[in-house]
């Protein structure tokens, strides 16, 4: 019973906090330079982790980077 509870809490923590944070940093680094296949993978990640990305949504920032002249 205790092992199941620990496993469930670990999976829940991974789904709600760890993987969305990794997804967020990946999207932030690759959003403007991704190929079409990579962009499809990004959309899949956002779809798959959508409920947990809502927890991180106040911190998401996808504003365009300033241009370098």
Swiss-Prot record:
It catalyses: a plastoquinone + NADH + (n+1) H(+)(in) = a plastoquinol + NAD(+) + n H(+)(out); a plastoquinone + NADPH + (n+1) H(+)(in) = a plastoquinol + NADP(+) + n H(+)(out). The gene is ndhL. It is an enzyme of class 7 (translocase). It comes from the Bacteria. It is found in: Cellular thylakoid membrane. Belongs to the complex I NdhL subunit family. It comes from Acaryochloris marina (strain MBIC 11017). This is NAD(P)H-quinone oxidoreductase subunit L. NDH-1 shuttles electrons from an unknown electron donor, via FMN and iron-sulfur (Fe-S) centers, to quinones in the respiratory and/or the photosynthetic chain. The immediate electron acceptor for the enzyme in this species is believed to be plastoquinone. Couples the redox reaction to proton translocation, and thus conserves the redox energy in a proton gradient. Cyanobacterial NDH-1 also plays a role in inorganic carbon-concentration. Its EC number is 7.1.1.-. Pfam families: NdhL. It is a multi-pass membrane protein. GO terms for cellular component: plasma membrane-derived thylakoid membrane.
